Amino acid sequence: MADLNSVIRIKPFHFIHVLDNNTNVTRVEVGPQTFTRQDHEKLVSGPEPMIMIPQRNYCTISNPVVRNENGSLVLDEYGQVKLRHGDEEIRFSQEPFPLYPGEKISGKVTALQVVAPLKALRLRALRDFTEAKVTHVAGDEWLFEGPATYLPRIDVRIEEEIKATIIGPNQALKLRANKACSDRSGVARKAGEEWLVRQHGAYLPGVDEKVVEIVNAYVLTDKKALHLKATKTFLDETRKTQRKAGEEWLVVSTDAETHIPDVYEQVVGEVHITTLSNRQYCVVLDPIGANGKPQLGHKQLRKGELAFFLNPGESLEGNKIHNIYVLTEQEALLLRAKETFSIDGESHLAGDRWMIYGPCDYVPPVQVEVVEKRESIPLDENEGIYVRDIKTGKVASIKGQSYMLKANEELWEKVLPRTVEEVLAKESLNPEFTDNRDSTRVVTYRAPHNSAVQIYDYKEKKSRVVFGPDLVMLGPDEHFTVLSLSGDKPKRPHQIKAIALFLGPDFMTDVVIVETSDHARLSLKLSYNWEFKVDRSKIEDAQKIFQVPDFVGDSCKAIASRVRGAVAAVSFDDFHKRSAEVIRQSVFGLDESGEVRKNFSFNSNNLVITNIDIQSVEPVDQRTRDSLQKSVQLAIEITTKSQEAAARHEAERLEQGARGRLERQKIHDEAQAELARKDLLQLQAQSAAVESTGQATAEAQATAEAANIAAEANVKQAELKAQATKIRSESEISLLKAKRENELSYQKSIDELELTKQSDLAEIEASKFKAIVESIGRDTLKSIACAGNEMQAKLLQGLGLKSFMITDGKSPLNLFDTANGIIGNNNQMVNMSNAAKQSGRRN
C-alpha cells in the first residue's frame, strides 16, 4: 500500500502540492507526469485541475505569487515562492495555471461586465493608483461609459450602474451638483446648484450630477397663460430680463407656445383668459400700471368686447363678471357714491344717493355702488304700499297708482300684532297667510255685510268706524280694534277674537243656574235674540257700539242677574208652571199698563235684546231631577192610559156599527140571490124545450158544415205542402249548387297551389341533388353506393331480421296518419253506402 500511495499519476492540466519534510517547503508538480513520492515528501493536496479562464472572463486570486519584470517567479532564501499576503490579483483569459501554495481563488470565474450604450458604471478608487498616466486617489469617483467591456481592477469598486435619461420634446432634465464640478457643457457648477438640460435626446449625468426630475413644458394657448414666481434673483433667458426674488409675471402664447419653468421659477398656476361680451363689464382690483407695477388700492373698469389675462396681483371685484344694466321704462337703479368724484360735469359727494331711470343701458363707474335695482310697483285702487323717507323718517301710504320709489325713499314694513295676524289668517282661510304676507303692502280687510270695524290712529289719537260691506285700508299709524268676546255655554271670557263687529239680528245662548224660593236649583238654557240699533250717519252712535269691549259677556251677565232675581222670588211649582212668563217679565220688565215690554236695551252700546227662548230647564240636584222625572213619567202614563181607554171605547163603537151594517148587507144579498135563482129556473125550462125540438136539425147541419170545412182544409193543406216542397227543393238545389261550385273552386285553387308547390320543390330538390352530386363527385358517389348496400346487408344479417324498411332521418314514416287514413277511407265508404240506401228508399 505504501508503494502504491507513493506513485501519483498527474493528468494533463492538473497539479499537486508536495511538502518536503526535510526543508518544510511546499512545491508544485504539474502534469502530465507520474510522480514518485519520496519518504521525506508528503502529498498536501491534489491532484486538482488547473484554473482555466475562458475568453472575456476573469477570476480573483488571493495571496498571489510575486513575479519579477520578466514574469518569472520570485523565490525566497528557502526556495519557497514569495506571496503577496493580504493582497489580491485579477487574472484574465490565459493558459491554464496552477495555484501555488498559499494562493486561493476568491469566488468563481466570472464573465466580464459589458456596459451597454446609454449606460455607465460609477467607479470608486479604493486606494491610490495611476492608470494611463492618470493618478487616482482613494475615494475618487468617475464614470466608465459604454458601449465597452469593463476590465475590473483590485483598486476600483463598482458603486452602481447609471442609465441615461431620455429628454423628449417639450421636456427638460433638472440636475443638481453634488459638489463643485463642471457639467458636460464645461460650465462650472457649485455644490447644490441646479440647472436644466433642454437638449432633446439621451443625457448621461456626470458622476457629480444628480437627476432631480424631468420637467414637462406647459402648453400655452390663446385662452391660457402661465403664472410664474421667482424664488431667487436670476436672469430670465426667455426674455433676457433680470428677475428679482418674489417677482411674479405671466407667460402668454405670444411669448412662447410652450414654456419649461426654470429652476428658479415657481409655477403658481394656470391663468385662464377673461372674456367680456359687448353686454358685460368687470372691475379689476389692484391693476398693473404703465410702469408694470401693481397700483394697490386702485380699481379699473373694463367693458366688453374684450379678452385679457389677469396679471399677478390683479383680481376681479366679487370674483365675477357683471352684466350691463338694461333698464326699461318701469325700472331704475339706486346708486350711491363710494367717494367724491365728478362725471359729465356733475359732482357727487361720498355717500350721495341718486337714481338712474330707464329706458337705457348703464355701466356703473368704479366710484359708484349700485344699491339695488328698482321696479315701478303697480297698484290697483284697492292696493297700496308703505313708503318711508329715510331723511325725515316720515311714513306714508301710497294707494291706487303705479309708484317708483325715489332715491331717499324705501319700503316700510308694517308689523301687526300677533292677534290681528291670527284673525286675518283665520278669515282668509290660508294657513300660510302669516308667512307669505308682504309687510310692505297696505293692510286691507274686507268688512262683511252688516258689520262694523273700528280703526284707531295712535298718532292722531282718534278712531274711525267703517260699516260693511266695505274695504278697510290701514294707514301707517292705524291699527284694528280687536274684539275679545265671551263664548261657549256657559259663557267664558276671551273665547272669540274678531275684528268685525256684526250688528245683528243674531242670537246667543247661555246657561244660567238659578235657585227658587224653596231652594230648588235649576239650570236654564236660554237663547237671546239681539241686534244693535245704530244710526250710521252719526259718528257718536258708531263709536258707541265699541264702548263695551265684551258686549256678549256683559249682556249675558246682566240678563242672568235679572233672571236669578226673578226666579228667587217664586217657588219651584210656580216657576215650573209659568217659567216663560217669569223669565220674560224679569228681562223685559213691565210698562205702565202692566204689559211685558217687547225688548231690553243697553244704553251703553245700543244693544237691544228682542226675544228670549227657553231651550231647557233642568234641576241641578240629582234627587230633584229624579223626582221630577218620575212625576213626569207618572203624568205621561196617566195620560197615555186615558187616551188608550178612549181609543178602545171608540173602536168598540165603530166595530158594533160595522157589524150591524154587515148583517143588513147579508140579508139583502140573500134576497137578491133568490130572485136570480127564480130567473135561472125559467131559462132552464125554455132551453130544455128548444133542445128537444132542434137537436136533429142542428146535428145534421153541423155534420155537413164539418165535412165541408174538412175538405177545404185538406185541399188548402195539400196546396201549401206542394208549395213548401217546391220551395224547399229549389233552395236545396241552389244551396247544393253553390256549395259544389265553392268546393270545386276551392279544390281547384288547392290543386294549383299543390302543383306549384310540388313543381317548386322538385326544382329545389333537383338543384339540391345536382349541387350535392357535383360537390361530392361521381367516383365518390359510386363508392358510397357500393359500400352502403354491403354494409346494410351485413348489418341486417347480423341482426337476424327477416323483413325490414330503411329510411333516412329527413323523411320519417308517419304511421299514425296512415292508420287515420285507412279509418277515414272506411268511414267514407260507409257514408257512401248509407247515402245509396237512402236514395233507393226515396225512389
Curated annotation (Swiss-Prot):
<dbReference type="InterPro" id="IPR040989">
    <property type="entry name" value="Vault_3"/>
</dbReference>
<dbReference type="InterPro" id="IPR036013">
    <property type="entry name" value="Band_7/SPFH_dom_sf"/>
</dbReference>
<feature type="modified residue" description="N-acetylalanine">
    <location>
        <position position="2"/>
    </location>
</feature>
<dbReference type="Pfam" id="PF01505">
    <property type="entry name" value="Vault"/>
</dbReference>
<dbReference type="InterPro" id="IPR039059">
    <property type="entry name" value="MVP"/>
</dbReference>
<comment type="subunit">
    <text>The vault ribonucleoprotein particle is a huge (400 A x 670 A) cage structure of 12.9 MDa. It consists of a dimer of half-vaults, with each half-vault comprising 39 identical major vault protein (MVP) chains. Dictyostelium is one of the few organisms in which the major component is actually two proteins (alpha and beta).</text>
</comment>
<dbReference type="InterPro" id="IPR021870">
    <property type="entry name" value="MVP_shoulder"/>
</dbReference>
<feature type="repeat" description="MVP 7">
    <location>
        <begin position="325"/>
        <end position="376"/>
    </location>
</feature>
<dbReference type="InterPro" id="IPR043023">
    <property type="entry name" value="MVP_rep_sf"/>
</dbReference>
<feature type="repeat" description="MVP 9">
    <location>
        <begin position="443"/>
        <end position="505"/>
    </location>
</feature>
<dbReference type="Pfam" id="PF11978">
    <property type="entry name" value="MVP_shoulder"/>
</dbReference>
<dbReference type="Pfam" id="PF17796">
    <property type="entry name" value="Vault_4"/>
</dbReference>
<keyword id="KW-0687">Ribonucleoprotein</keyword>
<dbReference type="InterPro" id="IPR043179">
    <property type="entry name" value="Vault_2_sf"/>
</dbReference>
<keyword id="KW-0539">Nucleus</keyword>
<keyword id="KW-0677">Repeat</keyword>
<feature type="repeat" description="MVP 4">
    <location>
        <begin position="164"/>
        <end position="216"/>
    </location>
</feature>
<dbReference type="Pfam" id="PF17794">
    <property type="entry name" value="Vault_2"/>
</dbReference>
<dbReference type="Pfam" id="PF17795">
    <property type="entry name" value="Vault_3"/>
</dbReference>
<feature type="compositionally biased region" description="Basic and acidic residues">
    <location>
        <begin position="646"/>
        <end position="663"/>
    </location>
</feature>
<comment type="function">
    <text>Unknown, though MVP-alpha is required for normal vault structure.</text>
</comment>
<feature type="repeat" description="MVP 1">
    <location>
        <begin position="2"/>
        <end position="56"/>
    </location>
</feature>
<feature type="repeat" description="MVP 6">
    <location>
        <begin position="273"/>
        <end position="324"/>
    </location>
</feature>
<protein>
    <recommendedName>
        <fullName>Major vault protein alpha</fullName>
    </recommendedName>
</protein>
<feature type="repeat" description="MVP 3">
    <location>
        <begin position="112"/>
        <end position="163"/>
    </location>
</feature>
<feature type="repeat" description="MVP 5">
    <location>
        <begin position="217"/>
        <end position="272"/>
    </location>
</feature>
<dbReference type="GO" id="GO:0005737">
    <property type="term" value="C:cytoplasm"/>
</dbReference>
<dbReference type="GO" id="GO:0005634">
    <property type="term" value="C:nucleus"/>
</dbReference>
<dbReference type="InterPro" id="IPR041134">
    <property type="entry name" value="Vault_2"/>
</dbReference>
<dbReference type="GO" id="GO:0009617">
    <property type="term" value="P:response to bacterium"/>
</dbReference>
<keyword id="KW-0007">Acetylation</keyword>
<feature type="region of interest" description="Disordered">
    <location>
        <begin position="643"/>
        <end position="663"/>
    </location>
</feature>
<dbReference type="InterPro" id="IPR002499">
    <property type="entry name" value="Vault_N"/>
</dbReference>
<keyword id="KW-0963">Cytoplasm</keyword>
<dbReference type="GO" id="GO:1990904">
    <property type="term" value="C:ribonucleoprotein complex"/>
</dbReference>
<feature type="repeat" description="MVP 8">
    <location>
        <begin position="377"/>
        <end position="442"/>
    </location>
</feature>
<feature type="repeat" description="MVP 2">
    <location>
        <begin position="57"/>
        <end position="111"/>
    </location>
</feature>
<dbReference type="InterPro" id="IPR041139">
    <property type="entry name" value="MVP_rep_dom"/>
</dbReference>
<dbReference type="InterPro" id="IPR041136">
    <property type="entry name" value="Vault_4"/>
</dbReference>
<dbReference type="GO" id="GO:0045335">
    <property type="term" value="C:phagocytic vesicle"/>
</dbReference>
